[in-house]
Design a protein with these regions (language model features):
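Walker B catalytic acidic pair
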Residues: 134-135
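Conserved phosphate-binding/catalytic loops and adjacent sensor/switch elements of nucleotide-binding enzymes
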Residues: 48, 52-129, 138-140
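Conserved catalytic network of the ASCE P-loop NTPase/AAA+ motor domain
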Residues: 33, 121-125, 151-152
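Alpha-helical sensor/transducer elements of the RecA-like P-loop NTPase core
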Residues: 6, 10, 26-27, 52-56, ...
């Protein structure tokens, strides 16, 4: 994988939630139910608190959470995959070891190979992990969409 200083670490951290937030138990319950399935989409206009809601809502279930805050710069599939691996390694450093080696061996590691390695590592880890792709609306590259579809 790239040197640690080439990744923006704050993109890999779940946002801090304040204690004085408005309680939204019904929405938090829906998020908790959504963790039982392979995919949960949360949509609303900009500024409606989606990130805050998810950050507050997924802290309770006890499931490890890998967080990746996306932006327009993450439309290159290689960059997206590097950040994806790093986000999962924040949860469990053993996940993505082979994928990191693939990046070191080749700057153009095939997405399917990297993702297959990640899926296998997640299976070996033996526990469910939630992955939050925050601000996914910035992703417009079909190759990144296909990578996410493969992962799901």
């Amino acid at each position: 994988m790239q040197k640690a200083d080439t990744l923006i670490h704050t993109k890999l951290r779940q946002p801090f939630t304040r204690q004085e937030l408005v309680s939204r138990p019904r929405l938090h319950e829906q998020i908790a139910r959504g963790l039982c399935g392979p995919l949960t989409l949360i949509t609303a206009p900009a500024g409606f608190g989606k990130t805050t809601l998810v950050a507050a809502g997924i802290t309770g279930p006890g499931m490890p959470v890998a967080w990746l805050s996306l932006d327009r710069n993450d439309n290159q599939v290689e960059r997206f995959l590097r950040y994806l691996v790093a986000a999962l390694q924040e949860v469990d450093h053993t996940i993505g070891s082979e994928a990191s080696q693939l990046f070191l061996a080749s700057q153009q590691a095939p997405a399917e190979t990297v993702l297959t390695s990640l899926i296998n590592d997640l299976d070996i880890a033996g526990r469910e992990t939630a992955l939050v792709l925050d601000d996914y609306q910035f992703i417009s590259n079909q190759a990144v969409h296909e990578a996410v579809a493969f992962l799901i």
